[in-house]
């Protein structure tokens, strides 16, 4: 399973990218607004740091508005993926953009039907929201398993980006369910490679080594 960073904090992306395990980045209007910087400038800077897909979301509501925005965003960098909301107008936009060879990430998916519709429209990625589904008592892992089964059974090319990840348990859970990708907030990313027992073990090793050298 691939790891994407769900942030637009360029300094954090640069710091974590050096680990060699960041496969892409996702953003949305909320995340971009926190940075207080020009949208295009931020996306271009991220694309210079990360080689993998970088999702940048449209803000238009009609098909024509989304397609116009998407065509412009797609010009910014070869690894830009245009994020489109799961709506009737969004599906129409994805269908058109797919014909033009523009990569898309259909976001805010909460049902199998929505995911399948996005696949049929030609979405490059589909993003089911794990945390938000759990908030309403829905089994998000079952959704991801079902979507992966549909992709494999019918031969769709879409990849699943598990979004709304709120902790290590979500990352591990979606990996077990067959998500192709988990997009993870930068604040959660450290949990992928840290553990108190690891720290304690290192401390013990160093203490024992120091005692050995003093003999």
UniProtKB/Swiss-Prot annotation:
As for subcellular location, the record says:
Cytoplasm
PROSITE patterns from the xrefs?
Answer: TRANSALDOLASE_1, TRANSALDOLASE_2
Q: Which reaction does it catalyse?
A: D-sedoheptulose 7-phosphate + D-glyceraldehyde 3-phosphate = D-erythrose 4-phosphate + beta-D-fructose 6-phosphate
Record GO cellular component, one term:
cytoplasm
Q: Which residues are catalytic?
A: 83
Pathway the protein takes part in: Carbohydrate degradation; pentose phosphate pathway; D-glyceraldehyde 3-phosphate and beta-D-fructose 6-phosphate from D-ribose 5-phosphate and D-xylulose 5-phosphate (non-oxidative stage): step 2/3
Q: One GO BP annotation here? A: carbohydrate metabolic process
Name any one GO molecular function: aldehyde-lyase activity
EC numbers listed for it are 2.2.1.2
Task: Extract the Pfam families matched here.
Answer: TAL_FSA
CDD domains the UniProt entry points to: Transaldolase_FSA
| InterPro entries assigned | Aldolase_TIM (IPR013785), TAL/FSA (IPR001585), Transaldolase_3B (IPR022999), Transaldolase_3B/F6P_aldolase (IPR004731), Transaldolase_AS (IPR018225), TSA/FSA_arc/bac (IPR033919)
Keywords tagged on the record: Cytoplasm, Pentose shunt, Schiff base, Transferase
**NCBIfam families given for it?**
fsa_talC_mipB
Q: What family classification does the UniProt entry report for this protein? A: Belongs to the transaldolase family. Type 3B subfamily.
Q: What does this protein do?
A: Transaldolase is important for the balance of metabolites in the pentose-phosphate pathway.
Official protein name in the record: Probable transaldolase
Source species: Streptococcus agalactiae serotype V (strain ATCC BAA-611 / 2603 V/R)
Q: What is the lineage of its organism?
A: Bacteria, Bacillati, Bacillota, Bacilli, Lactobacillales
């Amino acid at each position: 399973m691939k790891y994407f960073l769900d942030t637009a904090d360029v300094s954090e992306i640069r710091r974590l990218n050096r680990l060699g395990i960041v496969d892409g980045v996702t953003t949305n209007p909320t995340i971009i607004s926190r940075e207080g910087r020009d949208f295009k400038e931020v996306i271009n800077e991220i694309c210079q740091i990360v080689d993998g897909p970088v999702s940048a979301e449209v803000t238009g509501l009609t098909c024509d508005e989304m397609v116009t925005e998407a065509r412009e965003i797609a010009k910014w960098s070869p690894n830009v993926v245009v994020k489109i909301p799961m709506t009737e107008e969004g599906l129409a936009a994805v269908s058109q953009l797919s014909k033009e060879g523009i990569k898309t990430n259909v976001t805010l998916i909460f049902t199998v039907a929505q995911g399948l519709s996005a696949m049929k429209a030609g979405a490059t990625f589909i993003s089911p929201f794990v945390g938000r589904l759990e908030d309403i008592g829905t089994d998000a892992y079952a959704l991801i398993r079902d979507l992966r089964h549909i992709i494999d059974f019918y031969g769709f090319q879409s990849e699943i980006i598990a979004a709304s990840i709120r902790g290590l348990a979500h990352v591990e859970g979606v990996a077990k369910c067959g998500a192709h990708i988990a997009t993870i907030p930068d604040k959660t990313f450290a949990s992928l490679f840290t553990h108190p027992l690891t720290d304690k073990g290192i401390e013990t090793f160093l203490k024992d080594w120091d005692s050995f050298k003093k003999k």
